[in-house]
């Protein structure tokens, strides 16, 4: 079973410029490892994306542009926190990437 993600867990982005990004939200009242449990729809920190990853012509500069308002878009089908599916290592995020870091002592299936 995969480890449960938390606020501050790393995600890979699946694109250039910022190759990793952190989960920027979590439960205020369900805590693991002193951090809030991450859930589906929790936000990711703002980051940049390569223009070429968006199918935009390159050059001109800048190579990287802002890529805000991204979120966790997958979670457990059977384990919920605050009525939302918990996020786990391997679950997908809006940026074509996955959660890559979680609390190894807390696992959840489904």
What annotation goes with each model-predicted range?
Residues 2-110:
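Intrinsically disordered, low-complexity proline/glycine-rich segments
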């Amino acid at each position: 079973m995969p480890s449960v993600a938390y606020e501050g867990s790393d995600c890979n982005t699946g694109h250039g410029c910022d190759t990793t990004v952190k989960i920027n939200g979590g439960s205020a009242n369900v805590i693991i490892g002193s951090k809030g449990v991450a859930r589906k729809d929790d936000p990711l920190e703002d980051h940049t994306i390569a223009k070429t990853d968006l199918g935009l012509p390159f050059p001109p500069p800048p190579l990287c542009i802002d890529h805000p308002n991204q979120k966790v878009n997958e979670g457990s089908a059977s384990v919920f926190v605050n009525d939302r599916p918990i996020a786990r290592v391997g679950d997908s995020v809006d940026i074509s990437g996955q959660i890559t870091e979680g609390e190894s002592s807390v696992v959840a299936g489904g």
